[in-house]
A protein has these predicted regions:
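Conserved radical SAM core fold
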Residues: 2, 36-43, 144-151
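Acidic/histidine-rich catalytic cores of soluble enzymes
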Residues: 67-151
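A residue-level signal for conserved active-site and pocket-lining positions in enzyme catalytic cores
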Residues: 29, 110, 180
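Active-site acidic/histidine proton-transfer and metal-coordination neighborhood
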Residues: 10-106
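Conserved active-site loop/cleft motifs that coordinate metal ions or position small ligands
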Residues: 179-185
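Glycine/small-residue-rich interface belts in oligomeric ring/scaffold proteins
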Residues: 1-12
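Conserved residues at the C-terminal ends of beta-strands
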Residues: 32, 143, 183
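Gly/Pro-rich active-site loop or hairpin
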Residues: 8, 46-50, 56, 118-175
Length: 185
């Protein structure tokens, strides 16, 4: 869906998604906190948002629009990050929580993405976890990454590392038993 894109939501894609949801009745539906379409062209990548109040309002409005169309709550997943916008004014974890609170969506917390971003941007991944309210995390993802000269890349091509397992155990202590998926591509 690329909710963060400035393009309007594609009504055909939304209808196809709604039909699939009605047919399969999934327990949860998620979308990344990202953008990836410009002028009707899908870039097929999860591109980062500037974490500003303007981007937050935009993302919340489109998340609400998606939920209203689908007739159900969706989850928003934190991305892995390789760059940051200089004009961002809101830390990612605060932005993610604000989306959940304002749009009434849940959070899919990707522990590997937190770790990858923490190493790439030099922040404490445990503090990120501690800043997420307990009642809004509805799913957790784990995965492996590759180290590309000091920049960690979320590839899903490696086993889950010990540090991510440790963060996962912290997450379970904080959020309780949450459905968890190990991603492998």
């Amino acid at each position: 869906l690329y909710i963060g894109s400035t393009d309007p939501l594609d009504p055909r894609h939304l209808q196809s998604l709604k039909t699939l949801i009605e047919r399969t009745e999934p327990m949860l539906i998620s979308e990344h906190l990202c953008w990836g379409a410009v002028n009707g062209k899908v870039l097929n990548d999860l591109l980062p948002l500037p974490y500003t109040e303007e981007a937050l309002q935009h993302f919340c409005a489109k998340t609400t629009q998606v939920q209203e169309y689908l007739g159900r709550q969706i989850l928003i997943e934190n991305p892995s990050s390789y760059l940051q916008f200089a004009h961002s004014t809101i830390p990612e974890h605060e932005f993610l929580v604000a989306v959940a609170e304002r749009a009434g969506c849940g959070i899919l917390l990707d522990i590997n993405n937190i770790y990858v971003s923490a190493i790439n941007h030099n922040f404490d991944p445990s503090a990120y976890l501690a800043a997420i309210p307990v009642n809004i995390v509805q799913e957790i993802h784990l995965a492996g990454f590759e180290n590309n000269g000091g920049c960690l890349i979320d590839t899903h091509s490696q086993p889950v590392c010990d540090e991510v397992w440790k963060l996962y155990h912290q997450a379970l202590q904080r959020f309780g038993q949450v459905p968890t998926l190990i991603e492998w591509d």
